Amino acid sequence: MTAKTIRHYLQFKDFSLEDYEYVLERTGILKRKFKNYETYHPLHDRTLAMIFEKSSTRTRLSFEAGIFQLGGHAVFMSTRDTQLGRGEPVEDSAQVISRMVDIIMIRTFEQDIIQRFAENSRVPVINGLTNEYHPCQVLADIFTYYEHRGPIRGKTVAWVGDANNMLYTWIQAARILGFKLRLSTPPGYALDTKLVDAESAPFYQVFDDPNEACKGADLVTTDVWTSMGFEAENEARKQAFADWCVDEEMMSHAHPDALFMHCLPAHRGEEVTAGVIDGPQSVVWDEAENRLHVQKALMEFLLLGRLNH
């Protein structure tokens, strides 16, 4: 693979609509193979480096199991295992690590870190999560919606809660995939427009009232009130976000067959009630599982391109 052919997945907008149509189709195929216990090893002897500056259950398990199921291997590295944790420049780490593996996933803090890493990498780099964006999770959410309700184009998605990496990724997805996003965040926790492309403006609408944001929604989604790195603000956030808990009353404003999603881990009684997350409209377990399947399709696509079969 030459430098000119390398593609990275650092933000949702890095792929086109056609790319997503292909990856979602491949996700369905790979999931069926998984459910049917079919052996499929297109990435035989390929190695995935997983660099974690932020810990995770779902991200590590889904990527590690995913590359193994495709015939490859994974190497886990935390800041204790790399020179990144000891002050080595990101650019130097990228040069070294990318000479020894075939693909890299990074879960870190600032988007700038993964951007600089990718600019100096000889192999594809995947964003496993940054403070600004979480494209793999939203891709899994999109596939989950597709499984349950069909294409998301023209539908309405409601976001209730913090203006975090999930929300900024949903905004990018709305523009590329052609759906409407209605969002509501508490006063003092508003959208940072510097993280939003001007082209995305027609695809989202901001509401002060979370119930109004959920009106007619086909999908209602939320996340924790206190993301990793903001623990010192936890008590203040609990007070500020009290009216942004997705409960049965809020869901009643959505479409009658609306789905509920949460990227997990969830705090029942805070951002969502047990009645909603454990209720019939919730698809959070399918959503979590689908991280495995979309990331397998993503790695296959980044390493092999479009397959004819």
Curated annotation (Swiss-Prot):
PROSITE patterns: CARBAMOYLTRANSFERASE. GO terms for biological process: arginine biosynthetic process via ornithine; citrulline biosynthetic process; L-arginine biosynthetic process. Its EC number is 2.1.3.3. Pathway: Amino-acid biosynthesis; L-arginine biosynthesis; L-arginine from L-ornithine and carbamoyl phosphate: step 1/3. L-ornithine binds at N165, D223, S227, M228. Carbamoyl phosphate binds at S56, T57, R58, T59, Q83, R107, H134, P135, C136, Q137, C263, L264, R291. One of its GO terms (cellular component) is cytoplasm. It is found in: Cytoplasm. Keywords: Amino-acid biosynthesis, Arginine biosynthesis, Cytoplasm, Transferase. It holds the Pfam family OTCace. InterPro entries: Asp/Orn_carbamoyltranf_P-bd, Asp/Orn_carbamoylTrfase, Asp/Orn_carbamoylTrfase_sf, Asp_carbamoyltransf_Asp/Orn-bd, Orn/put_carbamltrans, OTCase_ArgI. NCBIfam families: orni_carb_tr, PRK00779.1. Reversibly catalyzes the transfer of the carbamoyl group from carbamoyl phosphate (CP) to the N(epsilon) atom of ornithine (ORN) to produce L-citrulline. Belongs to the aspartate/ornithine carbamoyltransferase superfamily. OTCase family. This is Ornithine carbamoyltransferase. It comes from Burkholderia mallei (strain ATCC 23344). The lineage of its organism: Bacteria, Pseudomonadati, Pseudomonadota, Betaproteobacteria, Burkholderiales.
